[in-house]
Regions:
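Juxtamembrane/interface alpha-helical elements of multi-pass membrane proteins
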Residues: 72-183
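Membrane-helix interfacial "entry" motifs
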Residues: 15, 19, 63-68, 100, ...
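Short, aromatic-rich membrane-interface segments at the entry and exit
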Residues: 43-50, 68-72
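Hydrophobic transmembrane alpha-helix segments characteristic of membrane transport
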Residues: 50-57, 138-142
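Transmembrane alpha-helix interface motif
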Residues: 1-43, 53-62, 168-254
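Membrane-helix interface segments
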Residues: 44-45, 65-66, 148-152
Length: 254
């Protein structure tokens, strides 16, 4: 696998059991788990606790530090804030449960709140698991092995590279502003940030164009090639994926 400077942004380089299994296996497995969570019914306690146990068991296999997990879980805050208002809303049915400070709490709103909290939190946790034990380029490699169209693979690969370009340019702009004595004080100091943002966009675009032209000069023809390496098999991860699908199928059949 080609090493890249952006691999460390999300991936946790630990001796995890899931670190060295095939990327396509991790991508497909996480997708199936998220699919099972998305189609599960929050009114079924067996499904809820089964999926919670499976997801957090897989999380324990990754050996991601709790502090890192909680920090990345903050992406769930907008969904949590949105879900907290749902109990006070109702669809067409006037299914009021009780009243709090002149605000009516409805059963449909409570159900929607638990649905969002359950699915969004577990879905994000699965995403944290995947990105924690798989580098960005390995994810693209796994998608390529899953026969995703080459145009999508190329777009994702360029996106990752250009994000890294913009991060580097942002660091340079920040250092240059600090060397010129820039200090953030009040709204007036936001004007230099606006100018710097425009310059950052232009410089990032120019650098991205140079990267693309250099790839063309080296024989790039639109196909992304990756070097494969030896991977291991995790029976525990495979069992959790299969069990997640079985739980969903049993609920749909029964």
């Amino acid at each position: 696998m080609y090493p890249t400077s952006h691999e460390h942004h999300l991936s946790i380089h630990e001796n995890s059991e899931l670190k060295n299994i095939k990327p396509q296996q991790k991508v497909l497995g996480c997708f199936l788990i998220v699919l099972s969570i998305a189609f599960s019914d929050v009114r079924d306690l067996f499904q809820i606790f089964s999926h919670i146990f499976l997801v957090f068991y897989i999380l324990s296999l990754t050996k991601i530090p709790a502090k890192t997990y909680l920090k990345r879980l903050t992406l769930d805050i907008p969904f949590v804030l949105f879900a907290l208002f749902l109990p006070f809303l109702s669809s067409e049915n006037n299914d009021k449960i009780f009243e709090i400070f002149s605000f009516n709490v409805y059963q449909t709103g409570v159900n929607d709140m638990f649905t969002i909290l359950f699915k969004a939190t577990l879905g994000l946790t699965v995403g944290i698991i995947l990105t924690g034990v798989t580098s960005s380029m390995e994810i693209i490699y796994g998608l390529q092995k899953l026969r995703i169209p080459n145009i999508i693979i190329a777009i994702m690969s360029f996106t990752i590279r250009y994000i890294d370009v913009f991060i580097d340019e942002f660091k340079r702009v920040k250092i240059s502003m600090a060397s010129r004595g820039y200090v953030e004080k009040g709204l007036k100091t936001l004007i230099p940030i606006a100018f710097a943002s425009g310059a950052l966009l232009i410089r990032g675009y120019e650098r991205g164009e140079r990267v693309y032209l250099s790839m063309i000069s080296r024989g790039f023809n639109g196909n992304i090639d990756f070097k494969s390496r030896n991977y291991k098999v995790s029976n525990k991860f495979n069992f959790c994926v299969i069990l997640s699908i079985v739980i969903l199928l049993l609920y749909k059949i029964l």
